Amino acid sequence: MNANPCEVCRFQNKQCVNNCMFALLFPSSDLEKFDVVNRIFGLETLTFYLKDLSPMERIDTTRTLYYEAKPCFLNPPKNPSKFLEALLNYPYQKAEEVSKTKKLLASYSRPCVVLALPAPKYTQSKSKPSVLRKRKRKTKSSDESAIRVVEDS
């Protein structure tokens, strides 16, 4: 039996035994730590999280739970209307963010300079000159003996 019971045993009005799981985690000198974690998570949840862990993992887990619970404890949400108000203002906040980003990008961009380059000159291939050839093709018409000259390109 310990002379100074841990905060968990003191909260439960129990006598703290030598192998108490919470003795190292919540000593009697640190009341605030247990109070914050207990109010946010509760004792049953805390016990559930810590029961299967090694002593070193328990210390890390307790520290993490405390750091997660402290902001909620210090700044509790007053009512659900604050949350709804934040959700309703979300699109407007994003629109403002986009406009600010566009202005910032515009301040970084340089004016675009277009150089007038001469038009490319197209040359003909020297191996096969393109010459229009005329050939005769027969077409069907009222006069079957008519021959028509067609230009191929």
UniProtKB/Swiss-Prot annotation:
Every LOB domain range: 4-105
InterPro entries: LOB
Signal peptide: none
Chain segments carrying region Disordered: 126-153
Sequence ranges of Basic and acidic residues compositional bias: 140-153
Annotated family: Belongs to the LOB domain-containing protein family.
PANTHER family: LOB DOMAIN-CONTAINING PROTEIN 26, LOB DOMAIN-CONTAINING PROTEIN 4-RELATED
Annotated Pfam families: LOB
The protein's name in its UniProt record: LOB domain-containing protein 26
Source domain of life: Eukaryota
PROSITE patterns: LOB (PS50891)
